[in-house]
């Protein structure tokens, strides 16, 4: 059970890190598409 919790925390952290890293790129791409 502890392994599942640790895996879930690691997955959430990795997804949050990739989201915060890709968010500026996605926002700039959306701005360029709407322009």
Swiss-Prot record:
The keyword Membrane applies. One of its GO terms (biological process) is symbiont entry into host cell. Induction: Expressed in the intermediate phase of the viral replicative cycle. Unglycosylated because produced in viral factories instead of the classic ER -Golgi route. Residues 23-35 are virion surface. Keywords: Late protein, Membrane, Transmembrane, Transmembrane helix, Viral envelope protein, Viral penetration into host cytoplasm, Virion, Virus entry into host cell. The chain crosses the membrane at residues 2-22. It is a single-pass membrane protein. One of its GO terms (cellular component) is membrane. It is found in: Virion membrane. The keyword Chaperone does not apply. Belongs to the orthopoxvirus OPG076 family. Component of the entry fusion complex (EFC), which consists of 11 proteins. During cell infection, this complex mediates entry of the virion core into the host cytoplasm by a two-step mechanism consisting of lipid mixing of the viral and cellular membranes and subsequent pore formation. Component of the entry fusion complex (EFC) composed of OPG053, OPG076, OPG086, OPG094, OPG095, OPG099, OPG107, OPG143, OPG104, OPG147 and OPG155. Except for OPG095 and OPG053, each of the EFC proteins is required for assembly or stability of the complex. This is Entry-fusion complex protein OPG076. The lineage of its organism: Viruses, Varidnaviria, Bamfordvirae, Nucleocytoviricota, Pokkesviricetes.
